[in-house]
């Protein structure tokens, strides 16, 4: 008898956090990400998102740079403190080389300029997931371990 294994969808269990103070941008993100069946939580400000990060685990976050209450870099810092493996993309319409470098130095995966294309979002999700898998994969030791039970 031949058994076929069920193939899991790539998007299965992928949770994405989006924070942007513009409702139309949030809706665009949700629409783009739901095409791939990603599970998306969207918030209009950083504090609302940070409350959720304690309750759930996200794979990727897209955070607007200019937000009310706290800016995107502050949200990035707090997200990384709560979950160092979370991949964060800073999104902005006001990109400068200095702010790009600052975001990367603070641990951002990338800096996405508005307006963006659907393909850019998908590429960043894929890149973030690949990076998370590399981080989670235990690195093999250069020196082999001695066999257990032999003295």
Identify the role of each PLM range.
Residues 23-41:
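Two-component/phosphorelay signaling modules centered on CheY-like receiver
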Residues 26, 68, 96:
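The feature encodes the CheY-like receiver
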Residues 44-45, 71-74:
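Acidic catalytic/metal-coordinating carboxylates
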Residues 51, 73-85:
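Short amphipathic alpha-helix used as the core "switch/output" element in two-component signaling
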Residues 57-62, 67:
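Active-site beta3 strand of CheY-like receiver
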Residues 74, 95-110:
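Alpha4 helix (beta4-alpha4-beta5 surface) of REC/receiver domains from two-component response regulators
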Residues 98, 116-125:
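C-terminal output helix
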């Amino acid at each position: 008898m031949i058994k076929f294994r069920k193939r899991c969808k790539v998007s299965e269990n992928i949770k994405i956090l989006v924070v942007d103070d513009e409702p139309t941008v949030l809706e665009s993100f949700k629409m783009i990400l739901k095409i791939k069946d990603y599970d998306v939580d969207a918030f209009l400000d950083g504090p609302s998102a940070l409350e959720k990060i304690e309750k759930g685990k996200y794979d990727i976050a897209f955070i607007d740079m200019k937000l009310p209450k706290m800016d995107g870099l502050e949200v990035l810092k707090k997200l990384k403190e709560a979950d160092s493996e979370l991949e964060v993309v800073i999104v902005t319409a006001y990109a400068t080389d200095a702010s790009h470098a600052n975001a990367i130095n603070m641990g951002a995966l990338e800096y996405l300029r508005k307006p963006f294309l659907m393909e850019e979002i998908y590429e960043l999700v894929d890149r973030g997931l690949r990076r998370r898998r590399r981080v989670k994969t235990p690195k093999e030791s250069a020196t082999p371990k001695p066999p257990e039970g032999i003295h």
